[in-house]
Amino acid sequence: MKFFSAYKTCIKIAVDQAIAYRFDFIVSMIITFLGSLGLPLVALLIYGAGAGFPGWSFYEVLLIQSLFTVSQAFTRVCLGDMVWTTMFHVREGSFEVVLLKPMNPLAYIIATTFSPGCFGNLLCGFVLLTYALWHIQIASFSAVFACLLLFIAGIAVMVSIYLIIAAASFKWVGNSRLPEIASSVEAFGQYPIEIFPVAIRAIASFIIPVCLIGFYPAAALLGRTGIEAFGSAGVALLFLAFGVCLYRKMIRMYQGAGG
């Protein structure tokens, strides 16, 4: 209950700040909205040139990429600054301030990293998703349920990646390349899995299940998933548990500015 109370308060503060500096917020919304259009524009150019991904129409690929954008943006809104906040405190030797707070350090970091600046990405994702859904045939009602289940699992994967990258910053202090690693890993979830070699498919499904971020939810909505998608969702729960445990372990290894 303490976490939810703190998170609610932090959301209110973040929203109040966005309202107070509304011009900056609006500009940020526009920039992030336009930035999220880059990926579908690339797909549009590919299909416009007469090429494409075998077995997938443009609107089906757009469905994958829009679900990927929504999942990524939602996670970034809720805790997107967790990696940078952790990196900052570790680099400056001020993580003791977090440890002195009367709540779990991980819960505190999550509660204080709500980021309205990513609302533009989220809005763009929903616009693209609506446009894609208008042009495709949903397989069935059960397909919608399966899509939602796999979508939630995809968010769990996103959270796990952020936790692991943030945990790594305790070891590799001040390494600004860590967030880039996260983005590179996530990118495998925004394309049809069939375009990758078998080894990459296995890794992206059952080791670091990034296919859940965009591909598997879209495939479920189209009625193209098998049992492997739900097996991947089970792996996502284990991946999340690993991320939480790793972050907590790295906190215990933190030595502070004088370490």
What are these regions (language model features)?
Residues 1-137, 141-259:
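Hydrophobic transmembrane alpha-helices and immediately adjacent juxtamembrane helices
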